[in-house]
Amino acid sequence: MTFWSILRQRCWGLVLVVAGVCVITFIISHLIPGDPARLLAGDRASNAIVENIRQQLGLDQPLYVQFYRYVSDLFHGDLGTSIRTGRPVLEELRIFFPATLELAFCALLLALLIGIPLGILSAVWRNRWLDHLVRLMAITGISTPAFWLGLGVIVLFYGHLQILPGGGRLDDWLDPPTHVTGFYLLDALLEGNGEVFFNALQHLILPALTLAFVHLGIVARQIRSAMLKQLSEDYIRTARASGLPGWYIVLCYALPNALIPSITVLGLALGDLLYGAVLTETVFAWPGMGAWVVTSIQALDFPAVMGFAVVVSFAYVLVNLVVDLLYLWIDPRIGRGGGE
C-alpha cells in the first residue's frame, strides 16, 4: 500500500468515527431526564413561558429534525448555540480549549521526561529494586482515580505545606497575559512578563502532575517492554562484543529502536489526557473544557455537550492519524506489509 492510500483510509476512518460520535452523543444527550427549557425558565415559570422557550430553542421539533439541523450546521462549521450562555459553542470552545491543551501538553511532557528514563533504567536493571518500584508505580497510577489523587496533592502541597496554589490558572490579583495562543506560559513569555509566567507555572504544577501520574507509569512500562526486546537482539550482542560502553549501547542503539513501537502509545496518551482533564479540571478549578462541559451537563446544555464530544473526538482521531503516518514514515515496511 502506498502512503496516499493509507492516508485516504485513515481520513475515511476519521470521518466515520466523528459521525458515529455525533449520532451517539445526540441520542444520549436527549435521553437524559430533564428539560433545558424548564431549567432556563425557572421553577416558577408558567407552562406557556416554558413552551415558548422550547420553541425558540427548537426543542419542540421531532428528534430527526433536530439532528438534521445539527448535522447541517456542523457541515457549515456551526456547533450550535449554548443554551446556558446564549453564545456560539465554537466561541466558547475557543476560550476554554487552550487552557485544556496547555494542561494536557504539560502533563504529557512530564510523563515523557520522567517515564522514559524510568523505563530505560527499569529495563537495564531488570528484576532489581528499581524495576519493581517502576512496576508498582505503573499499577498505582493506573488504579488511582484522578480526582482522589488531585484532592490528595491539594491537601498536601496547598493545605499543609502551603508551597503551591490549589487551583485556578493565575492569582486573582494578576491580569492574564495578552491573548495570542491562549497558553498562559507562552503568552507571558511573548509578552515578556516574568511575574505572570512564574505564577502561571506554579498553578500548572499540581494539575499537570496529577494528570501525568497515570500516563507516567504507562510510558515507563511501554519503554521497558520495548527496551527489553531490543536488548535481547543480535545487534546489541554484537555491539557489546565490539567493546562499546554499556550506556552508549543502551542510549544510541537500543533506545532509538525502542521508541519506534512506543510512538503509538505516546501519541495516543495526548488524546487520553484531553478526556482525563475533565475530572482534573473540576478538582483544581482549572478554567478549561473539562470544567466547562461539567457545568454544561448539569444545565442540560445539549449543544455544548455535543460540541465538546465532537471536538475532543476529532482531536483524538486526528492524533491517531498523525501517529499512524509518523509510524509509517519512520518504518516504511508497514506500508508494504512488512512491519510488525
Question: Where are the model-predicted features located?
Answer:
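Residue-level signal for discrete positions within transmembrane alpha-helices
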Residues: 96, 100, 136-143, 152, ...
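An internal, D/E-rich "acidic patch" concept
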Residues: 3, 60-116
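Alpha-helical membrane-inserting segments
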Residues: 24, 28, 118, 122, ...
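Hydrophobic alpha-helical transmembrane segments of membrane transport/permease proteins
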Residues: 17-68, 157-196
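Hydrophobic alpha-helical membrane-insertion segments
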Residues: 18-23, 141-162, 269
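N-terminal signal-anchor/first transmembrane alpha helix
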Residues: 1-60, 90, 94, 121, ...
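Alpha-helical transmembrane segments of integral membrane proteins
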Residues: 2-6, 97-130, 176-340
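Residue-level recognition of pore/gate-forming positions within transmembrane alpha-helices
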Residues: 14, 22, 44, 111-112, ...
